């Protein structure tokens, strides 16, 4: 357990930041799931719009250090590929 005042403060800040980051992570995942749901529904235009809405949020999570850059790039790439496959199908 933290003994010095600054260590106690850091422990408080770490807990607060952990909770905040968890909510941001959850929000980003929700946006990704919304895009996936639109893809599974088979609606190309809605899926494209949902991805357009989700991309800036996903990018901001990278800038905040919530997700790794490659993870978000991989998700965006896969979602985009699924949407393109929808259009051709």
Curated annotation (Swiss-Prot):
InterPro entries xref list: Ribosomal_bS20 (IPR002583), Ribosomal_bS20_sf (IPR036510)
Pfam families on file: Ribosomal_S20p
One of the GO biological process terms: translation
Keyword Isomerase: no
GO cellular-component term (any): cytosol
Cross-referenced SUPFAM superfamilies: Ribosomal protein S20
Region (Disordered): 1-26
Superkingdom, natural source: Bacteria
Biased composition (Basic residues): 7-22
GO molecular function terms listed in the Swiss-Prot or TrEMBL record: small ribosomal subunit rRNA binding; structural constituent of ribosome
Keywords (A to Z) from UniProt: Ribonucleoprotein, Ribosomal protein, RNA-binding, rRNA-binding
Protein's job: Binds directly to 16S ribosomal RNA.
HAMAP family, per the entry: Ribosomal_bS20
Family affiliation: Belongs to the bacterial ribosomal protein bS20 family.
Protein's name according to its UniProt entry: Small ribosomal subunit protein bS20
Species name: Marinobacter nauticus (strain ATCC 700491 / DSM 11845 / VT8)
Lineage of source species: Bacteria, Pseudomonadati, Pseudomonadota, Gammaproteobacteria, Pseudomonadales
Gene behind the chain: rpsT
């Amino acid at each position: 357990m933290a003994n010095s005042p600054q260590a106690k403060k850091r422990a408080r800040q770490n807990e607060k930041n952990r909770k905040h980051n968890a909510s941001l992570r959850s929000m980003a995942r929700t946006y990704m799931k919304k895009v996936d749901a639109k893809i599974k529904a088979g609606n190309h235009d809605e899926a494209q719009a949902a991805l357009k809405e989700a991309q800036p949020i996903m990018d901001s999570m990278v800038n905040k250090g919530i997700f790794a850059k490659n993870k978000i790039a991989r998700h965006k790439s896969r979602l985009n590929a699924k949407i393109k496959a929808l259009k051709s199908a």
